[in-house]
Amino acid sequence: MPTCSLPSRVKGSRPTRLNRYLESAGRWQEILDPALTVDKPHYRFNLAGREPFTLDGKEQVGMLYGHWTATNQCIFYVEDEDVAVGDHMVIGRGIGYQQTLGSELAAAGLDVDPKALYLKKSQIMMLWPYDDQCRLLGEDVWEFDTAEAGLFKLDPADVLTVAQSRKLLDPFIKPLPPFDDSLLPK
């Protein structure tokens, strides 16, 4: 089976961490660079309390990233995460937190202030498959256990903006080295 040597690339340059930093810094366009992501990525989401949905292609993925960035919903983090790395995928499981618009939570049927921003807590599982050149094929994201779920209304002074996040994360965002074609099967 061909391998992209993802374990060694993850150890040296951490592509999934780079994607997270770029996303939370509002620099999502860089995630869709052809060196990092295939031309037609496929994203699947199964979020508690919502209908599952998919995104096909960079245009749809970019629309979601763009919306999250414009509304400060691209700010998220994961704690207590376990990560497994294989030849063609990275899997993470942990407790995720994401700033989320009250209006979107209300549209999903939750009794919240639609004008507020919330910090949403959930148990999540994420899978990032990669091709032979270590380019992202997409994402699968599941909120799998509502027992640990939480929703915290944020005081406007506690909302982290994309500009603030970018200032904090930019020093940690380093470009990946070029893909080494010698890793491809002969």
Model-assigned labels for residue ranges:
Residues 20, 49-53, 112, 116:
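Conserved aromatic-histidine-acidic binding/catalytic patches
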Residues 8, 56-57, 161:
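Secondary-structure junction/capping motif
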